[in-house]
């Protein structure tokens, strides 16, 4: 008797299932890369010294490049967070750190911004947390 019940339920389930399912949607792919060569420095017309294509009638941010600020202040990867810090503790941490008040465009400019904000030092830190910079080093182009 149990066999007949199970067979009836199975047969009913087979009849209740639809026979034609819609096909899956086609896969989406990323667009192909451009077939032309991109110009250097983002716009091809800048000269990187602030006197080129920026500010006033230009096409950049004052240095002829894209909005990267001209040069890399901090190395890519772990030490990529620019900070202005007051005190270094054994080379492991820096105290009283904050993001620079203006965007620096090179190492000496980064130092002058930090000095103007209370005599702080320009640093590149791994993990800035609540005014504490963990594992910091000097930025590119500074001593």
From Swiss-Prot:
Residues 41-64 are annotated as: 10 X 2 AA repeats of N-G. It comes from the Eukaryota. Keywords: Cell wall, Disulfide bond, Repeat, Secreted, Signal, Stress response. Residues 42-63 have a biased composition (Gly residues). Sequence repeats lie at residues 41-42, 43-44, 47-48, 49-50, 51-52, 53-54, 55-56, 59-60, 61-62, 63-64. Its main location: secreted. Residues 20-67 are annotated as: Disordered. Residues 1-17 form the signal peptide. One of its GO terms (cellular component) is extracellular region. Transmembrane segments: none annotated. Induction: Expression is induced by carbon starvation. Disulfide bonds join 74-124, 85-97, 125-136. It is found in: Secreted, Cell wall; Secreted. The keyword Metal-binding does not apply. Residues 20-37 have a biased composition (Pro residues). Aerial growth, conidiation, and dispersal of filamentous fungi in the environment rely upon a capability of their secreting small amphipathic proteins called hydrophobins (HPBs) with low sequence identity. Class I can self-assemble into an outermost layer of rodlet bundles on aerial cell surfaces, conferring cellular hydrophobicity that supports fungal growth, development and dispersal; whereas Class II form highly ordered films at water-air interfaces through intermolecular interactions but contribute nothing to the rodlet structure. Homotetramer. Further self-assembles to form highly ordered films at water-air interfaces through intermolecular interactions. Belongs to the cerato-ulmin hydrophobin family. This is Class II hydrophobin qid3. It comes from Trichoderma harzianum. The gene is qid3.
């Amino acid at each position: 008797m149990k066999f007949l019940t199970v067979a009836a339920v199975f047969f009913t389930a087979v009849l209740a299932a639809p026979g034609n399912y819609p096909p899956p949607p086609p896969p989406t792919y990323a667009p192909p890369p451009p077939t032309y060569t991109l110009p250097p420095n983002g716009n091809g017309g800048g000269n990187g010294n602030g006197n080129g294509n920026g500010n006033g009638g230009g096409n950049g941010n004052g240095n002829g490049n894209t909005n990267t600020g001209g040069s890399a202040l901090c190395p890519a990867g772990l030490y990529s967070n620019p900070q202005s810090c007051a005190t270094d503790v054994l080379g492991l941490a820096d105290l009283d750190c904050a993001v620079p008040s203006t965007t620096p465009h090179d190492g000496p400019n980064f130092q002058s911004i930090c000095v103007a904000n209370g005599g702080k030092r320009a640093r590149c830190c791994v993990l800035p947390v609540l005014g504490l910079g963990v594992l910091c080093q000097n930025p590119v182009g500074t001593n």
